[in-house]
Amino acid sequence: MLLAAGEGKRLGTPKALVELGGRRLVDRGADLLRDGGTAPVVVVTGAAPVTVPDVVLVPNPDWRTGMGSSLAAGLQALPGDCAAAVIALVDQPLIGAGVVRRLVAAHHAGAELVVAAYHGRARNPVLLARRHWAGVIAAADGDTGARPYLRAHPGLVTLVECADIGSPDDVDTPEDLARVAALLAG
């Protein structure tokens, strides 16, 4: 699931629509999940109408309240046969499909709450096994997303180191966008 509902105040435009290397961040994020082996790919939208091929679009009418409402909307829209959900953010274009594959592999090995780590620091994306969705939805508030639930269940969280294959750098400002574009250009 890709959370892509925000308006991007500091960036001056909805992040989902921002182009990086000739591609919108929302398309990059959908490809990240698809190439990482997740299906269906759900994109939660809000501030800007977005069309993305081959995804399930979930509009969040409460997007102004923050990431928590988008997370809840997306989890509630997933089909009943989904055993887990990988949650990624639209503004982290340096996370590659290999990160998603590592989270999925940890889940297949028995982990239920899987968090990508970069140099030991927990960041996004995260994988949430279905049995935790109701608790995550209940705890999600404002821009905290799944963080309160994960902090309340530290013994169930599996950190998966991903610094060798990705970076959680956010695109929040025009300066961030320029820096990330330079990194992608090599």
What role is predicted for each listed range?
Residues 1-122, 155-162:
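Nucleotide and nucleotide-moiety/phosphate-recognizing core
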Residues 8, 18, 133-134, 178:
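Nucleotide phosphate-binding site architecture
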Residues 72-74, 133-136:
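Short beta-strand and adjoining strand-loop segment in the mid-core
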Residues 82, 123-135, 174:
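Conserved nucleotide-sugar donor-binding
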Residues 94, 99, 132-135, 176:
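Short, well-ordered alpha-helical scaffold segment located
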Residues 138-186:
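Conserved alpha/beta core of the MobA/IspD/sugar-nucleotide pyrophosphorylase nucleotidyltransferase superfamily
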